[in-house]
Amino acid sequence: NLLQFENMIRNVAGRSGIWWYSDYGCYCGKGGHGRPQDASDRCCFVHDCCYGKVNGCNPKKAVYIYSLENGDIVCGGDDPCRKEVCECDKAAAICFRDNKDTYDNKYWNIPSENCQEESEPC
């Protein structure tokens, strides 16, 4: 669920997902359309695509099981849908961490007109 995703981002990327990514680029926070503005926004685009492939549960509400082992996130549990959501969140948290240096405040709260291009396929 979104609270677990927030905690995962904090654990992996060392920053708040709500503060840094809730309204960033064309894909972070709000649905999404257009071209990802940078690598951090692309993390959100890929995360949206990942959620779109999940079947059997609501990715934003599904409560999953994960642990932090030697700094790595390990998704667990027997429910394949919840585990898939966990893997989507894990990949995004790692992507945010790996692209912290590309984050640019100019993409925070950008006008929707900047996101009018046709979206690329997942």
UniProtKB/Swiss-Prot annotation:
Q: Which residues constitute the catalytic centre? A: H47, D89
On the tree of life, the source organism's domain of life is Eukaryota
**Name of the protein in question:** Acidic phospholipase A2 2
Q: What is its EC number?
A: 3.1.1.4
Checking CDD domains in the record gives: PLA2c
Q: Where in the cell is it found?
A: Secreted
Q: Which reaction does it catalyse?
A: a 1,2-diacyl-sn-glycero-3-phosphocholine + H2O = a 1-acyl-sn-glycero-3-phosphocholine + a fatty acid + H(+)
Q: What class of enzyme is it?
A: hydrolase
Q: Which cysteines are joined by disulfide bonds?
A: C26-C115, C28-C44, C43-C95, C49-C122, C50-C88, C57-C81, C75-C86
Essential cofactor(s) = Ca(2+)
A Pfam family name for this chain? Phospholip_A2_1
Q: Does the keyword Metal-binding apply?
A: yes
Locate the transmembrane regions by residue number. Answer: none
Function, in words: Snake venom phospholipase A2 (PLA2) that has high lipolytic activity. PLA2 catalyzes the calcium-dependent hydrolysis of the 2-acyl groups in 3-sn-phosphoglycerides.
Describe tissue expression: Expressed by the venom gland.
Q: Which family does it belong to?
A: Belongs to the phospholipase A2 family. Group II subfamily. D49 sub-subfamily.
UniProt binding sites for Ca(2+):
Y27, G29, G31, D48
Q: How is the cofactor bound?
A: Binds 1 Ca(2+) ion.
Instruction: Provide the organism lineage as a comma list.
Output: Eukaryota, Metazoa, Chordata, Craniata, Vertebrata
- Gene Ontology BP annotations: arachidonate secretion; lipid catabolic process; phospholipid metabolic process
One GO cellular component assignment for this chain's record is: extracellular region
UniProtKB keywords: Calcium, Disulfide bond, Hydrolase, Lipid degradation, Lipid metabolism, Metal-binding, Secreted
InterPro entries xref list: PLipase_A2 (IPR001211), PLipase_A2_Asp_AS (IPR033112), PLipase_A2_dom (IPR016090), PLipase_A2_dom_sf (IPR036444), PLipase_A2_His_AS (IPR033113)
